[in-house]
């Protein structure tokens, strides 16, 4: 296909420029060789007789004809000519013979002499093989080109021409006016067109779609009609005047849709339709300004839009002249009118030197036949005499600059041949039909041309690719030579121009056979031809180069409307330019200085090699040529000139890669039409060298790309044959372009404006991914000053996506809607969406549009709440966690201390309230020591991390079963007694079994020694109680396994001392010289939570060399009558009967002691009457056994209790006398020296501390008060009593007085007692933690206590003072710090929190110091390991991992456990960490933190629960609860996030930072109970998801509930939860019945089940109950209690929702607990006697088994410890609150039964029993006859674990039991008589604690904890391993839903 412009011969007499875009589909045979002959103007070309008609006197006449008979004859005349009415059917002209135009040789000169100005010769480019070469004959340099000669010759005779159109064979001929000579060039298409070689088909095709714009609704001639009919014969083509069907607005929308769907078919169908009756003048007369759409816009425009385009074209001062010429010379094309406003400072070199206002029409002979179609200069009869041809060319072009406002060309981003759709925002492209292409009608090959500005030396505009002085014109030398694939390599003056043609077959899809529609306002090849022909003899600086693309696709652009006027766009290959409307002059003005540019444009330079986009700022006030009009428009003052610019110049590299229509354009309004030579040159240089893409900013009023309907599949495939030839660039003239380095971002110019983006990247995705792109492109765009806008950088979006803000709406929203409605087509296919390849670079739709790697969908990031930490809290945290942070204490002034104390008081109240309520609902969870070693707890915290407690506890049980402890030979079982613990875990002696005698000192003098019981407590009233026994024997250092210090370790439940208590180990010497070391044992307390009582415990430690050990038999034989082996229950009853106080039973049972202030005086009675007689110790006394304590003469247990618990009610009763604590003998009690010393010691220890030891026992001490808190007394306040600092100081004085009193005592240095911090972090003055390593001096002891914070901090660093030396020797140097040793390489996990400088220690040296001070003592029984850790250490990791597989994370945990054990052996030589109990809390914390895998939370758990230090771990439950309750303030949450919707809670360490400074003053007991209650509360009520807020006792103060409640008020009611079903039965009638009935026959109870009816015998005996008091209101309380007990009567699947009045519940909390205390404690419901109504008496007892989805309730029998069924079972632990239970099987039930058994035979009819074990009726008869039932034993968890478990057993619930695995599988037969009178309880079986309690009401939860039990696992007594529950006990709902058929199979562990 040859140059489209070749077969559009131009007349030298025509000077008007016309815009035309002719769509030619693939059906049109484009292989037309045209031969343009211009007799006087055009040529250097050889004239052909076949291509011209003879001249007449008036001008040149051109005729275009084709097979369809379309003929256009254009003549030039001096006068006005008639316009062609496209609405009228023209008369057909007889077909003329079509012949092939001959190829002209350049050997003959043209008729017109060439310009005298020589043009440097350029080298000829080698053409590709197989193609003809079109070479222009070389001429002499002095000979002017023929075009110029012709132009000069014919300038005076320029006339208008007429066109003749032949639609359907009829020829419309219009003669020119007389006097004008119009040579006629005929372009014929005939049969010869097939003779062109097929190689031509490889060249590109340029598809030009045209629409006729008309104000009428009639359909005018369309481009498809003309194209399919071969509209343009080569011989009949008019001189550059082409029919512009692109701008037809008269087409119906259905035609738009048809054209969109099938453009080719549309063209073909309308090829022979005539236009109508309207003339061209009428058509354009009806057009409105700015409303001439192109092919795209015509589809997207509404018919209601004004189409008066002539008014727009003629808006200047010379509108009339232009209108006349337009009507005569422009047929369906936009003639570029002259601009009367001409810049006054135009330079001569720029062809703008002359005022264009004076020469508006000086265009004659400027644009000759060398110019391709679409543009030509309008004929102007008035020519200034001073204008030469060269100047006229530039003037004409300059006129276009000022009169045309659109110059758009944009890159294509089509990536494939298929599915190429027209994209919104794409610019029109400059396409010309290649007439050389013959025989390519099927291939549809098109050519795309680009226009580039190239700077040259002389500053003249010339067409790129022009030859030198010779006749070589690769582009435009001949019509048949300029459009080949040959490229221009030799440009004059080093012009860098590219012209390439490529052809590829279009897709078979007919929608793809329509090439880009070219607006008639497009600067086409014809224009460039004319420029080249006119300026080839002049070394012009300004050249227009045409470049084609290598890319595959040419995407059709669309129109953007501005101010209601369509903005035609043209897009082409690299630097392709379209010149819509009035901007042809831009093609010649390469750079123009703008008078007032507010902002400089920016250029985006794309570098394909790096795939990056760079912004470059152009020079100040510089704008490229095609930007000129847009910039000049900003300064246009004439109201008639309302012009805007919308243009983009796009590289060819991005052609064919656009897959979506989001090609972006930027707009800039033209300013005043003044130009500058320098600026023009500078811009030209930039364009030439960098091949920039010029993209002015988007017009702010333009429509976005999403608002314009798309036109489908208008694109052109371009083959890859493109060859680019480039000459070496010569030095550019003008202002040089600023070069930027790769990756360098230019500095943006101008000020950003609102709604715009300055310097944004303007790039499409495909432009960065096209592999064919090999040249860098740049984009520059400037601001739009007229609209006060700045160029918005927008980038193309992905396929099918629209870029918001890419194009600002240019039309009203209503117009856009109308457009969209008009083009609706139900048959139109959607845009194809191609999937993004993995890792592809895709546009990011951010504000500034950065290019980011595509990584798929980004997850929504959840915001995490943050704690609002105040500076005082942060400072206090540092002080508490870092003992060496004494310098920070300076920041704590009195105001801060006062404020912090107020905060502590607030939290004290919150904690007390929380514990009280939780105690009421969740049961008693006060401290009760478990056995176990420190290593057990360390491994335990490994297992409890990030998993629920039931899984972690099962994992530890599995380890204990897999690696059991090897039995020791010295162990022997002890007799069953209340205070003994056997080796097998039943019960042990009071002081343990491993106690050994050290000589016979204790045995010989035990009877002669009076034991002194001394309770100690710190100044803050901690719950630490020590029972110190002082016996006199020489060399006796201590008792069962603790160091020889009085306050070395308070009892396990007493380690909460916040104040360090200085003890007096070996400080008292008897008269006989015997010294008794008084020591304490941290695990020496035995407590019974079942009866709220405690026993003595003695723990054996690893240091045996200095211990005085004695067996339980020794104690029992010497100190207690053998006949008085009272059981645990008997002791409790004894105490209750002997209680003389007026306290109620529950208050006396509060630790088993009457809490009466009147008994305070008995403190000394119980101590001084030790030698009288012996009574059994009450089990509820939480004494700490130290030293050789003997209890020979206790009057009775109540006296002892009263003596120890004297100070219990000190806070409640302010009338406590001070004399109660004086050491004076009580009347009636003999006072000897020993007892006085004991009394004095006891009194001293009430307030003993590290302060000065001055004697002043003037004030009572609250040590005992806080040591013994009632477990169940509701009359006692749950607030922990604390003493003031004054009392503390007074106690210090009392201690000092005691020391002085015994100043003559001999203290043995070898037995010196070192105190040790037992409570962990003992804070003094509320700020610091004190260590207790203070020796007790015989004479005077320095006052180590100081309220000064700095001194306290310094004292904290004195952890190991005197550990390795004798206390007496080092007593004066008490404040010396222990020697610090370098680290031995042990792993330090992290620096201590809050520590400014981490101190490292040799941990093994620390252990050695402890051993040196205390000796190598043997471990006590309570400190024994639960697992054989040495075996685990030697085992393989896989074996350990398999053992804990059920827990999860087993591999990692197995490695950590083994690494930990290996470290112990490597560092210390053995697996033993018991020495940590005697190390300072800070040192212990640092050591634990150094263990790999332990964090702060885990370390705090070990310290609080095992080491009994002052600590408070914050786990997920605690953190969540504190946030929800509002205890921890949060930073403001986002508006969209409410507290009850919060998912990401703050970091646990931050929560702990806030809490610990406020909780550090609490004692260890309170912290323990608070922690235990909180973790249970988090499992039962405040779960992570769906918390049970309706039943929560804390919801009145809960902010989470308030937030949820406030939100729920606005929400619609939702469906009720499955687990919460409101019962329609009244609550009273539903629940007011007895659960535990033992007076009726047991058989009736056993026979009752869900399958049997209510037997009458169930109600034979009345249900009576004894009220707690005679007051009638207690009946109401009984009703409440009954409601709690029995609420599952009507339907086992229903869980009644009891809505409580929470306000009333909160107010009456304590009174409610007191009123129901008897029932809650141990009210025996089977013995209740009360008259009830007959209705209640008729309610049957609950079922034996009640199955629900989440839990299964079983009615069980409570077995006493002496029950015959328990023979062979381990005896229950004394402190275990849970008894053994018996679960009864229903007859016919099996271990795998999930449903109630049914009768399966007809035994009643036959009278014979079947043998089926699942038949309910037969088995019921058998069991009734045998008087036996089947049952499964339930074992208390503490007893099952033998009282030993990590972390003090907090894994388990206080009421948790295990199902015996053997009896669960094979039930045991139980005689009915054995369970006849046993009380009945309820056990809740489930998979976990949260699932069991999910959805229960407050009463039901309370009943479960106080009356019932929970069970989540089975227990194999043989292997001692956990087992899953059998289906009979509970079958998980999850397994039922998964496989209902396998309901009978054995269930595994459920993970609900």
Curated annotation (Swiss-Prot):
<feature type="binding site">
    <location>
        <position position="1589"/>
    </location>
    <ligand>
        <name>[4Fe-4S] cluster</name>
    </ligand>
</feature>
<feature type="binding site">
    <location>
        <position position="1592"/>
    </location>
    <ligand>
        <name>[4Fe-4S] cluster</name>
    </ligand>
</feature>
<feature type="compositionally biased region" description="Basic residues">
    <location>
        <begin position="1388"/>
        <end position="1398"/>
    </location>
</feature>
<feature type="region of interest" description="Disordered">
    <location>
        <begin position="1302"/>
        <end position="1334"/>
    </location>
</feature>
<dbReference type="GO" id="GO:0035514">
    <property type="term" value="F:DNA demethylase activity"/>
</dbReference>
<keyword id="KW-0004">4Fe-4S</keyword>
<feature type="region of interest" description="Disordered">
    <location>
        <begin position="1367"/>
        <end position="1398"/>
    </location>
</feature>
<dbReference type="InterPro" id="IPR003265">
    <property type="entry name" value="HhH-GPD_domain"/>
</dbReference>
<dbReference type="GO" id="GO:0005634">
    <property type="term" value="C:nucleus"/>
</dbReference>
<feature type="region of interest" description="Disordered">
    <location>
        <begin position="72"/>
        <end position="157"/>
    </location>
</feature>
<dbReference type="GO" id="GO:0040029">
    <property type="term" value="P:epigenetic regulation of gene expression"/>
</dbReference>
<dbReference type="InterPro" id="IPR028925">
    <property type="entry name" value="RRM_DME"/>
</dbReference>
<dbReference type="GO" id="GO:0051539">
    <property type="term" value="F:4 iron, 4 sulfur cluster binding"/>
</dbReference>
<protein>
    <recommendedName>
        <fullName>Protein ROS1A</fullName>
        <ecNumber>3.2.2.-</ecNumber>
    </recommendedName>
</protein>
<dbReference type="GO" id="GO:0003677">
    <property type="term" value="F:DNA binding"/>
</dbReference>
<keyword id="KW-0238">DNA-binding</keyword>
<dbReference type="Pfam" id="PF15628">
    <property type="entry name" value="RRM_DME"/>
</dbReference>
<keyword id="KW-0539">Nucleus</keyword>
<dbReference type="GO" id="GO:0006284">
    <property type="term" value="P:base-excision repair"/>
</dbReference>
<feature type="compositionally biased region" description="Basic residues">
    <location>
        <begin position="130"/>
        <end position="139"/>
    </location>
</feature>
<feature type="compositionally biased region" description="Polar residues">
    <location>
        <begin position="769"/>
        <end position="778"/>
    </location>
</feature>
<dbReference type="GO" id="GO:0141166">
    <property type="term" value="P:chromosomal 5-methylcytosine DNA demethylation pathway"/>
</dbReference>
<dbReference type="InterPro" id="IPR028924">
    <property type="entry name" value="Perm-CXXC"/>
</dbReference>
<keyword id="KW-0479">Metal-binding</keyword>
<dbReference type="InterPro" id="IPR011257">
    <property type="entry name" value="DNA_glycosylase"/>
</dbReference>
<feature type="binding site">
    <location>
        <position position="1582"/>
    </location>
    <ligand>
        <name>[4Fe-4S] cluster</name>
    </ligand>
</feature>
<comment type="function">
    <text>Bifunctional DNA glycosylase/lyase, which excises 5-methylcytosine (5-meC) and 5-hydroxymethylcytosine (5-hmeC), leaving an apyrimidinic (AP) site that is subsequently incised by the lyase activity. DNA demethylase that is indispensable in both male and female gametophyte development. Involved in the regulation of DNA methylation in the promoters of RISBZ1/BZIP58 and DOF3/RPBF, two transcription factors that functions synergistically to positively regulate genes that are key players in the development of aleurone layers.</text>
</comment>
<feature type="binding site">
    <location>
        <position position="1598"/>
    </location>
    <ligand>
        <name>[4Fe-4S] cluster</name>
    </ligand>
</feature>
<comment type="similarity">
    <text>Belongs to the DNA glycosylase family. DEMETER subfamily.</text>
</comment>
<dbReference type="GO" id="GO:0046872">
    <property type="term" value="F:metal ion binding"/>
</dbReference>
<feature type="compositionally biased region" description="Basic and acidic residues">
    <location>
        <begin position="709"/>
        <end position="720"/>
    </location>
</feature>
<keyword id="KW-0378">Hydrolase</keyword>
<dbReference type="InterPro" id="IPR003651">
    <property type="entry name" value="Endonuclease3_FeS-loop_motif"/>
</dbReference>
<dbReference type="InterPro" id="IPR044811">
    <property type="entry name" value="DME/ROS1"/>
</dbReference>
<feature type="compositionally biased region" description="Basic and acidic residues">
    <location>
        <begin position="727"/>
        <end position="747"/>
    </location>
</feature>
<dbReference type="GO" id="GO:0051747">
    <property type="term" value="F:cytosine C-5 DNA demethylase activity"/>
</dbReference>
<dbReference type="GO" id="GO:0019104">
    <property type="term" value="F:DNA N-glycosylase activity"/>
</dbReference>
<dbReference type="InterPro" id="IPR023170">
    <property type="entry name" value="HhH_base_excis_C"/>
</dbReference>
<feature type="compositionally biased region" description="Basic residues">
    <location>
        <begin position="90"/>
        <end position="102"/>
    </location>
</feature>
<dbReference type="Pfam" id="PF15629">
    <property type="entry name" value="Perm-CXXC"/>
</dbReference>
<keyword id="KW-0408">Iron</keyword>
<feature type="region of interest" description="Disordered">
    <location>
        <begin position="693"/>
        <end position="778"/>
    </location>
</feature>
